[in-house]
């Protein structure tokens, strides 16, 4: 009897946790499900929802977007920001929507969550899509800093800024922030030649309802580094194991995404192969906006 009540308590706790999450679905629930996992820590799914979620659903998918616990619209003062916490919330989404399998679409940091979840629960995943996703964090940080050292080789002030970041603890929120702040200041996340379509998508998003809820929890990275030991990882060996386990992996990246080196991209492409890899022209980190038509077309061809 005691074990029965303990089981009941655990089940209740499991589902109660999921209720704190912001979750929104798009499309017909009978279609193939895709769960979108946003970047971060401190991110949210508003840009994806405000520009792309419904259009992806219109391709014949059941799209589920959510904000991770403690991030965006999923406020939770007790959030731990660990991968395990993210896994349990993903499992609660599977339960809530009665999903046996789903495609996991991970963007940026969400790609790490997606990869680690797929490795732990391969039977839950019908396909893993990495979209501008992180996979070798230290190589990304090194690439950002080395690129900028070359760019500013004759600028002592800029070199000093870079050196300060370079000498921080590489397993700290400050180091991560420093690298990405420098990348942002130098246009690493911007497409070089915005198109009429991308300009409209960004402007409509900024004028719309989703932008108003673009909530950023600035404490999220600090708590992630405090609570999560796997805070500077390389998932390529894990991706090989996922592929060997029979889960299809698809990768789509922007040619102008400044946070990845050519060597990184080539190493990733070698894992999945030519037919499961797409490299989009005139496209940076937010590829589902920068080149939305090509992004949607690739996903439809791969997943339908």
Model-derived segments and spans:
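The serine-hydrolase catalytic nucleophile loop
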Residues: 41-52
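Glycine-rich "HGGG/HGxG" loop immediately N-terminal to the catalytic nucleophile
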Residues: 46, 68-83, 139
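Conserved alpha/beta-hydrolase
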Residues: 57-73
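Conserved acidic catalytic loop of the alpha/beta-hydrolase fold
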Residues: 87-102
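Conserved hydrolase catalytic core segment
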Residues: 100-143
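Flexible "cap/lid" loop of the alpha/beta hydrolase fold
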Residues: 128-171
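Short beta-strand/loop motif that positions the catalytic acidic residue
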Residues: 245, 251-253
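Catalytic histidine-centered segment of alpha/beta-hydrolase-like enzymes
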Residues: 283-292
């Amino acid at each position: 009897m005691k074990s029965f009540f303990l089981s009941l308590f655990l089940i209740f706790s499991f589902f109660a946790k999921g209720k704190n999450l912001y979750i929104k679905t798009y499309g017909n629930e009978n279609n193939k499900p895709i769960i979108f996992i946003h970047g971060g820590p401190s991110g949210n799914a508003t840009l994806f929802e405000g520009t792309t979620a419904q259009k992806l659903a219109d391709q014949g998918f059941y799209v589920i977007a959510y904000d991770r616990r403690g991030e965006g619209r999923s406020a939770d003062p007790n959030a731990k920001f660990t991968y395990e916490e993210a896994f349990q919330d993903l499992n609660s989404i599977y339960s809530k929507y009665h999903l046996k399998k789903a495609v996991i679409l991970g963007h940026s940091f969400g790609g790490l969550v997606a990869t680690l979840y797929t490795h732990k629960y391969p039977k839950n995943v019908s396909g893993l899509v990495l979209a501008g996703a992180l996979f070798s964090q230290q190589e990304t940080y090194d690439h950002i800093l080395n690129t900028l050292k070359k760019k500013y080789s004759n600028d002592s002030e800029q070199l000093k800024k870079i050196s300060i970041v370079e000498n921080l603890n590489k397993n700290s929120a400050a180091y991560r922030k420093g690298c990405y702040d420098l990348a942002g200041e130098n246009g690493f996340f911007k497409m070089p030649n915005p198109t009429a379509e991308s300009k409209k998508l960004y402007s409509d998003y900024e004028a719309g309802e989703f932008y108003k809820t673009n909530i950023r929890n600035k404490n999220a990275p600090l708590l992630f580094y405090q609570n999560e030991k796997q805070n500077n990882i390389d998932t390529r060996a894990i991706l090989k194991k996922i592929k060997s386990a029979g889960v299809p992996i698809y990768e789509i990246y922007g040619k102008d995404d400044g946070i990845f080196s050519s060597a990184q991209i080539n190493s990733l492409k070698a894992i999945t192969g030519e037919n499961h890899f797409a490299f989009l022209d005139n496209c940076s980190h937010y590829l589902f906006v920068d080149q939305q038509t090509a992004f949607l077309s690739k996903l439809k061809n791969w997943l339908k």
